């Protein structure tokens, strides 16, 4: 009945009446996502009628409800045949200011029309393979990049940027050819990185360092949404970027990683939005070549170093809250390097563990990122080892019992999801510099057996990667408990597969123990 009435008024052709009836339809069906199949033909005819109205050049006040209704109807894949013609797609491109490269964005009154047109295109392209093919033929990705360049520094048109970026994300998600076009032909990597810089209002203090105002206001909802869409589009553009072949590529990835470091250190308007923002930043960091992730940490300036040394001494004894803040800040500094971003990643990982669900989608990206960072960058590994595997003092409880980050990760080593338990074990193994004896010390033999069996290390030894050597960090508690722990060591094996006699196994272990040290 709603479609019949709307179609009758739309065909009558009076702009004021069309505006009223379509606004009523839009208000009533704003949250409708499932449609009656009996009215399918009426909805198709209503779409055709709306395009005829849009061609006439009706006022903006009438164009907006027309596009709102078209957006609602385009949620139904079955009625998109009359919508996905080249003529109708061109109408939407014109209304979205995508039809001309030199068209300006000066008329504020047109902004709602541009936004609604982009929303329609998002739905239509996502739901129709015909529209996807037309998007390639009409070079829609290039037109979207041109629109972004017009508005990348204009904060008052965040909605336009947001839906432009969303449409870019949809296109690059559905077509690998568009990913390649965005990356190389359209210079999508620097363009989208600049969009992020604008959303975060970044002020650079060095080539790869930005000023962080911890006391500043959170991002606005519009800035946060815009940043999230840019992060998602960048993920698609860089999804195959495992190796850097040119110096210019390396520089651009480092700039992007520095922007993502800034992203991790700011907050959105709500806790949920902050988590969504950081989650997309983590996903994108996973695409950055690991050699470029060194910019996640940066040296303290002379002023910061002096302030770090003086803060605790200057605070009087009764200033407990201030001292707690200073201690927290000090915990994010390691070996003269600012580790705030790594600390945020570690906290993010722990929150995802505490959720207790969707580990594969929510936890494995950040665990993989921290593992690769630790393997490639010594300072990051040493900082994470200090946070996750501090000197072992609790030798009375099993490694998986407790509420520390170590306990939580050890519990994951026996998780039912193979991918989750593998990456949790790999992370701890890398923090132990791939030394079997060190891993057993922190996790226990039973928890580590799966990883060691997969790597052929059940008899001991270490992994293939090289790590620097440092001093022994065994605590007195661990040294006292060690004789008991040695009783649980597995027996040795002879080349023919028979068990080594106990005396020979113990003497071999003593030699190994004398020539090795448990390090950082």
Swiss-Prot record:
Task: Write out the entry's keywords from A to Z.
Answer: Chaperone, Cytoplasm, Guanine-nucleotide releasing factor, Phosphoprotein
Which Gene Ontology molecular-function terms are recorded? G-protein alpha-subunit binding; guanyl-nucleotide exchange factor activity; protein folding chaperone
Signal peptide range: none
* Keyword presence, Plastid: no
Query: Record's GO cellular component, any one?
Result: plasma membrane
Keyword presence, Chaperone? yes
Record-linked Pfam families:
Ric8
Q: At what positions is Phosphothreonine found?
A: 473
> Sites of the modification Phosphoserine?
468
Localization annotation: Cytoplasm, Cell cortex
Superkingdom, according to UniProt?
Eukaryota
One GO BP: sensory perception of smell
Q: Quaternary arrangement and interactors, per the entry?
A: Interacts with GDP-bound G(s) G-alpha proteins GNAL and GNAS. Does not interact with G-alpha proteins when they are in complex with subunits beta and gamma.
Q: What does this protein do?
A: Chaperone that specifically binds and folds nascent G(s) G-alpha proteins (GNAS and GNAL) prior to G protein heterotrimer formation, promoting their association with the plasma membrane. Also acts as a guanine nucleotide exchange factor (GEF) for G(s) proteins by stimulating exchange of bound GDP for free GTP. Acts as an important component for odorant signal transduction by mediating GNAL (G(olf)-alpha) folding, thereby promoting-dependent cAMP accumulation in olfactory sensory neurons.
Tell me its family: Belongs to the synembryn family.
What's this protein's name? Chaperone Ric-8B
- Organism this protein belongs to: Rattus norvegicus
Q: What is the lineage of its organism?
A: Eukaryota, Metazoa, Chordata, Craniata, Vertebrata
Gene designation = Ric8b
